[in-house]
Swiss-Prot record:
It is found in: Cytoplasm. Binds 2 [4Fe-4S] clusters. One cluster is coordinated with 3 cysteines and an exchangeable S-adenosyl-L-methionine. This is Ribosomal protein uS12 methylthiotransferase RimO. GO terms for biological process: tRNA modification. Keywords: 4Fe-4S, Cytoplasm, Iron, Iron-sulfur, Metal-binding, S-adenosyl-L-methionine, Transferase. Catalyzes the methylthiolation of an aspartic acid residue of ribosomal protein uS12. The lineage of its organism: Bacteria, Pseudomonadati, Bacteroidota, Flavobacteriia, Flavobacteriales. It comes from Flavobacterium johnsoniae (strain ATCC 17061 / DSM 2064 / JCM 8514 / BCRC 14874 / CCUG 350202 / NBRC 14942 / NCIMB 11054 / UW101) (Cytophaga johnsonae). InterPro entries: Elp3/MiaA/NifB-like_rSAM, Methylthiotransferase, Methylthiotransferase_CS, Methylthiotransferase_N, Methylthiotransferase_N_sf, NA-bd_OB-fold, Ribosomal_uS12_MeSTrfase_RimO, rSAM. [4Fe-4S] cluster 1 binds at residues 18, 57, 91. It catalyses: L-aspartate(89)-[ribosomal protein uS12]-hydrogen + (sulfur carrier)-SH + AH2 + 2 S-adenosyl-L-methionine = 3-methylsulfanyl-L-aspartate(89)-[ribosomal protein uS12]-hydrogen + (sulfur carrier)-H + 5'-deoxyadenosine + L-methionine + A + S-adenosyl-L-homocysteine + 2 H(+). CDD domains: Radical_SAM.
């Protein structure tokens, strides 16, 4: 007599949004694996799993739309019997759970950003405290994100992050060092430190800004060769970090410091706690303290009340400062933020035109800066082979958002996951082409 075999569940974790969501998904998958669950993050047509977890983003309109569309897609697949269960977590779920439960009720359950144990229980797993940050990384083997804090205490008028992530909570240095040691044992060479605000690190735990002390502890971890800083805040920046960056070779001469705008009237309305003069001086201090450092920033155009004069001030600032890397976004009018009380008075087409103009300006700046690199030799980490090229990065470039170094695979072989000295032979606005030196 033949018996029907029981289908083994396979859980597919789909991640939308920022690197902090990537980290959260990796923690979730690590917990699931420790519970003996089969888990994947590869959504393929042949085998995408029968239980779906969607880790959503709820930051701005485009991200929210992408998350909603993904939920609808898998809710429809569930209705058609193509998947068995659908669970939703992350920022969109945290922010809009009642609305989502009403509008898309065929999702099995919604969870917020702090409900990992509850999500695991719904997936038939137990939360294991002893894992201490162990996770199933989804990035190339040579780098990993390290989330040093959660939430944010800044009062920025346009930002909904505190609504979804709560107040700032730093992770203890000893916990982060242990996590870094585990990553290094698994082959990670580059740590990318992330938080809503790196510069606030330690104020809650240690009653002082403690980022430099954390960096020193992480730099002592054997196997870690690069440490990269993302998402610093211009107000209250701990300058001892720059002193450490200059003398500690493991800390990349790179910082991501979203400035958002530079016009004093817009900065005041945004509640950024700084001015054009203070910001300009801070950036000059950065470059004086660490000559050659790469500065990445993010700007917002079309904020309520932004005049053509405000925009011209911003353009002049971009031209003057010549940022190494930049992103620019059209303002998104977010419910329950302070700025939502203001009239969203800049037309969408004007917002987008201004964003395009800023990025065109930055493209020329990037072209000029990259041409200066031709003929120079840089130590690069090789992330992957893609098509006809090996793809790497210098210490001045972060994954996914910055320049890449492309090496012709038909002419040269370099080992992925390793450091190689590369001579730059050609450059475009956002890519460098090189060969082993």
């Amino acid at each position: 007599m033949r018996t029907k075999s029981l289908k083994k569940n396979k859980i597919n974790v789909i991640t939308l949004g920022c690197s902090k969501n990537v980290y959260d998904s990796e923690v979730l998958m690590g917990q699931l694996r420790a519970n003996g669950k089969e888990v994947t993050h590869e959504a393929t047509a042949k085998d995408e799993g029968n239980i779906i977890v969607i880790n959503t983003c709820g930051f701005i309109d485009n991200a929210k739309a992408e998350s909603v569309n993904m939920i609808l897609e898998y809710a429809d697949k569930k209705d058609k019997g193509l998947v068995d269960k659908v669970f939703v977590t992350g920022c969109l779920s945290e922010r809009y759970r009642p609305d989502l439960e009403k509008e898309i009720p065929n999702v099995d359950q919604y969870f917020g950003t702090t409900e990992l144990p509850q999500l695991l229980k719904a997936l038939g797993a137990d939360y294991k405290h002893e894992l201490l940050g162990e996770r199933l990384t989804t990035t190339p083997k040579n780098y990993a994100y390290l989330k040093i804090a959660e939430g944010c205490d800044r009062p920025c008028s346009f930002c909904a992050i505190p609504l979804m992530r709560g107040s700032h909570v730093s992770q203890p240095i000893e916990k982060l060092v242990k996590e870094a040691q585990g990553l290094a044992k698994n082959g990670v060479k580059e740590l990318i430190l992330i938080a809503q605000d790196l510069t606030y690190y330690g104020l809650d735990l240690y009653k002082k800004r403690n980022l430099a002390e954390l960096l020193e502890a992480l730099a002592a971890v054997e196997g870690i060769e690069w440490i990269r800083l993302h998402y610093a805040y211009p107000t209250g920046f701990p300058m001892d970090v720059l002193e450490l960056m200059k003398r500690e070779p493991k800390i990349c001469n790179y910082i991501d410091i979203p400035l958002q705008h530079i016009s004093d009237s817009i900065l005041k309305s945004m509640r950024r706690g700084t001015t054009q003069a203070k910001t300009t001086q801070l950036l000059k201090d950065f470059r004086a303290a660490v000559p050659g450092m790469a500065i990445r920033t993010t700007l917002i155009v079309g904020y309520p009340g932004e005049t053509q004069e405000d925009f011209e001030i911003l353009k002049e600032f971009v031209q003057e400062m010549k940022f190494d890397r930049m992103g620019c976004f059209a303002y998104s009018h977010e419910e329950n933020t302070h700025a939502y009380l203001l009239e969203d008075d800049v037309p969408d087409d004007v917002k987008q035109a201004r964003a395009n103009e800023i990025m065109e300006l930055q493209s020329q700046i990037s072209w000029d800066l990259n041409q200066e690199k031709v003929g120079q030799v840089f130590r690069c980490i090789i992330d992957r082979k893609e098509g006809a090229h090996f793809v790497g990065r210098t210490e001045f470039d972060s994954p996914d958002v910055d320049n890449e170094v492309l090496i012709d695979a038909s002419k040269h072989y370099v080992k992925t996951g390793e450091f190689v000295n590369i001579k730059i032979i050609e450059a475009t606005e956002f890519d460098l082409y090189g060969e082993p030196a």
